[in-house]
Amino acid sequence: MIQQARRVAAGLLCALLFLFCPTTLAGCGKVSAPASASAVLSAVCADPDVTGRDVPDTCAIYTRTADTESADYLSDTLFSALFGEAARGLLSGSDPAPAAINDAAVCISVSPTPFEIAVLRLSDVRGTATAAGICRTRLDAVQNAWRGTEQEAVANAGAVTVEGSYVLLVIAPNPERVLRAARAAIRAGGS
């Protein structure tokens, strides 16, 4: 009687494993690739909670994925002009060191208002301190440029944050709202 109960229990266990194991394993295979920096920036700019409130209508967007001949291409020269001398070589790397930042996208207001979003995606989280440092330098420069103006509070509200292998720089009227949209886009991945 006990042996028969054990056989029935083992049979039920095998049936349950047979039914649920493929479903569980299929779910494991749905790990999406990391979102590109331009995909994160596009998602932020398209987010209805951000658009119209925090993103001005007149923005210039520069991405690493744009055609190298395009005016929208985020070149090493433009990147180091924006983020300072410490940023030189971080996008392109140098022999034999690979690029520390393997993808980047920047949105800058072309109207006279302090607004900027930078999304930097790194190949290794160990480089986030360096990337956050250049973003902090950029934020300090923007804050100094707007000191004593009516937009000083917006510049001073800017934030630099690290989200896994991403570093985000946000200068906006409500940086937390922009960061929430960026975090959601990062979590969604490249799907």
Predicted segments, located by residue:
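Bacterial N-terminal signal peptides that target proteins for export
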Residues: 2-13
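A short, solvent-exposed beta-edge/loop patch
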Residues: 109-111, 121, 151-191
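Bacterial N-terminal signal peptides
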Residues: 11-24
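Post-signal peptide N-terminal segment of mature Sec-exported envelope proteins
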Residues: 35-52
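Short, compositionally biased low-complexity segments enriched in polar/charged residues
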Residues: 59-114, 126-127, 155
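Extracytoplasmic/secreted envelope proteins and their assembly/folding machinery
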Residues: 38-41, 117-119, 128, 132-136, ...
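Short Gly/Thr-rich strand-loop-strand
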Residues: 125-163
